[in-house]
Amino acid sequence: GTSGAGGAVSMILSVVVALILAGCVAAFFAWLIGLPVLRLKSDYLAIATLGFAEILRAIFQWQKLGPVTNGANMLKSFPTFTSFNIKSASGSTVLYLSTFVPFFFSMLCIALIVLLVNSTYGRAFKAIRDDEVAAEAMGINLAKHKMLSFVTSSFFAGVGGALFAMYVANAQAKVFTSTMTYEILLIVVIGGIGSISGSIIATFLYVACSEWWLRFLDAETYIGAFKVPLLRNGFRMVVFSIVIMIVVLFFRQGIMGSRELPEVIAGWKAKRKARKDSKEASANG
């Protein structure tokens, strides 16, 4: 029992240390990139950061840096979540905890982000987002807080990348393409820029819609001898793109806007109570 507990603690610590190191490395590169890039604003800032991301991806695939980055080869020598699976005496897996461990670490990161957003630094970030001129007039150091926001968000992005690599049990630079970046940005836009719970909801909806609910559209379907037109490989993404465009057009601020789920629930309860009180008042009147 003692050796088992010691092994479990060692395994957990190795994963935690790897996640923290991944976040710190991402934060360090963000600090280096942020020195010249954060002088830009709006679309120029987005284009510059995307450009640097592609440059870094190309550098990490450079074969001459193979001894350091493993080049374009697949990297597997790091802790993975499969170690958390519970096995029987015969060696067969009886409980796949590797599926749930990423959710635990994700919830921990979300809790830390919520604490940050509700802190004095988080309020400063919101003030800069809403109006930089007004924020500077209030005495907020724009350069300092922009850099802090950039580095902090990159830290959590690094942790997310490490979670992804540990879940699939391998890492390769070519996997992290600009397409993945656009998907993440799209999830944020759908959920609502400035809403943590909105991003969480949009993540589940995005994955469920693109990978599960519309999967049947990729399969050729026959009704008797008649072949249903359009239903073929790739049609799923066409329909999914149309759904995304409709959502963006009709929900300009995303599903949640800048609100959080508790605020939406509280507002819904208040409206329900107001309608109930109004009905009771009209009935008594």
Regions found by a protein language model. Give the residues of each.
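Transmembrane alpha-helices and adjacent helix-loop boundaries
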Residues: 1-285
